[in-house]
């Protein structure tokens, strides 16, 4: 992950405040290992509670949907995870990408199957609303498309997730972006709400068509 400190400006999206909070949260350095370890322990405990309370679900609505991105690649949704929770007060979309190390051919199918076991590593993070799991694209990159309640919470998760992904990913292939003020379903229904010019014109994270 590149250690970026600048915030990438976006066009104002529907429902977004017209101030600095409308800027995308771009990549920051990963969190320290000790912070990540504590966060993962809390997350695993919260995930177990959600499962016990039957508040975590695997909706089938979007499974099989194909997303085409501005960089010319496309990927299929192979799983969705959703959390029963209260109203989302500060919605945002988080998009993460990575490329697995030394995985080829049938290895991708095996990863998609076993990735269900990774649920305790993300399901209990504060603010999670939903996650769509996207299969590998033409360049071998996986993506996660999340809705989160709170951009800062989403960013904290992404910076913790980096440490986990780094264990199995090609160096330099892990990236994320947080898009404040946007709901995932809005993005799925109207991908044109995102700007099509400037840095976003050919961005790996910007959906341009849904089928």
Segments from the language model and where they lie:
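Short, non-transmembrane amphipathic alpha-helical segments
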Residues: 161-165
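Conserved short beta-strand edge segments in small beta-sheet-based binding/regulatory domains
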Residues: 166-180
């Amino acid at each position: 992950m590149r250690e970026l400190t600048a915030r990438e400006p976006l066009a104002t999206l529907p429902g977004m405040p017209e101030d600095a909070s409308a800027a995308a949260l771009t990549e920051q350095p990963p969190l320290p290992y000790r912070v990540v370890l504590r966060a993962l322990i809390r997350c695993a405990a919260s995930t177990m509670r959600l499962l016990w309370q039957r508040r975590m679900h695997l909706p089938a609505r979007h499974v099989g949907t194909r997303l085409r991105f501005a960089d010319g690649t496309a990927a299929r949704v192979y799983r969705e995870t959703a959390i029963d929770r209260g109203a989302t007060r500060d919605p945002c979309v988080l998009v993460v990408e990575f490329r697995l190390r030394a995985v080829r051919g049938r290895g991708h199918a095996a990863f998609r199957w076993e990735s269900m076991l990774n649920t305790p590593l993300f399901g209990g993070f504060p603010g999670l609303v939903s996650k769509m799991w996207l299969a590998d694209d033409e360049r071998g990159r996986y993506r996660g498309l999340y809705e989160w309640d709170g951009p800062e919470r989403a960013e904290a998760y992404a910076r913790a997730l980096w440490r986990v992904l780094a264990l199995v990913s090609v160096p330099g292939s892990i990236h994320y972006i947080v898009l404040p003020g946007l709901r995932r379903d809005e993005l799925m229904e109207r991908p044109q709400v995102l700007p099509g010019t400037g840095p976003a014109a050919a961005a790996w994270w910007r959906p341009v068509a849904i089928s």
